[in-house]
């Protein structure tokens, strides 16, 4: 799936060798400022490395068509960006960008419910809390059926009970649909409970 060799990025990351396996959940842990978010950006070619190789399916991410890569590998930031006025429009936005067929409303609502987001499709995005926007971004991305989801603290704004429910549903959906999850989390409990693999990064290096 992903393979990194001899990767260096400024003074932020220095990774000799790292692989992410397909159809697994990898949790990335470590102190703030250690390079976790930067690693996700490298995987999606949002920033360019100074040295080494980042390969996706055996091909350098820099050689992939950017649009195609980001359809296959979707990244959700800790504070996800929303593009539209209503919840329904937000869930449909990815399909309209690619001219793909938009799912039926029942499918949109079902995905929201799986992510513990019980809102009408007509609800204005601007009235959602930070945690609700995180769940909306997860639902929007899962509907697009990516090969890989890169998640940067996807549940940081949720209470513990809701966080566990959302991550459980996310993990179940990913396993059933062959989606690879690479998730940054500060919660060791989440990493140990849901991660097939755990990668710890400190000061830009794999521990």
Give the ranges of each region predicted by the language model.
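Helix N-cap at the start of a conserved alpha-helix in ABC-type nucleotide-binding domains
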Residues: 160-162
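Conserved catalytic motifs of ABC-family nucleotide-binding domains
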Residues: 80-89
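Catalytic Walker B motif of ABC-type/P-loop ATPase nucleotide-binding domains
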Residues: 149-153
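Conserved ABC transporter NBD signature motif
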Residues: 52-60, 69
């Amino acid at each position: 799936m992903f393979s990194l060799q001899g990767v260096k990025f400024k003074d932020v990351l220095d990774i000799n060798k790292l692989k992410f396996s397909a159809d697994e959940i990898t949790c990335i842990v470590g102190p703030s400022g250690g390079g976790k978010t930067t690693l996700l950006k490298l995987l999606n070619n949002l920033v360019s490395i100074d040295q080494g190789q980042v390969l996706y399916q055996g091909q350098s991410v820099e050689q992939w068509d950017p649009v195609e890569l980001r359809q296959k590998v979707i990244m959700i930031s800790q504070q996800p960006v929303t593009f539209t006025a209503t919840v329904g429009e937000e869930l449909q936005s990815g399909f309209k960008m690619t001219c793909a067929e938009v799912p039926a409303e029942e499918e949109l609502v079902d995905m929201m419910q799986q992510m513990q987001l019980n809102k009408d499709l007509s609800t204005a995005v601007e009235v959602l809390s930070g945690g609700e926007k995180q769940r909306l971004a997860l639902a929007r991305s899962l509907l697009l059926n990516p090969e890989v989801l890169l998640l940067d603290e996807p549940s940081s704004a949720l209470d513990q009970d809701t966080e566990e429910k959302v991550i459980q549903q996310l993990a179940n959906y990913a396993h059933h649909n062959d989606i690879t999850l690479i998730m940054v989390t500060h919660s060791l409990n989440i990493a140990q409970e849901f991660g097939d693999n755990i990668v710890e990064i400190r000061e830009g290096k794999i521990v």
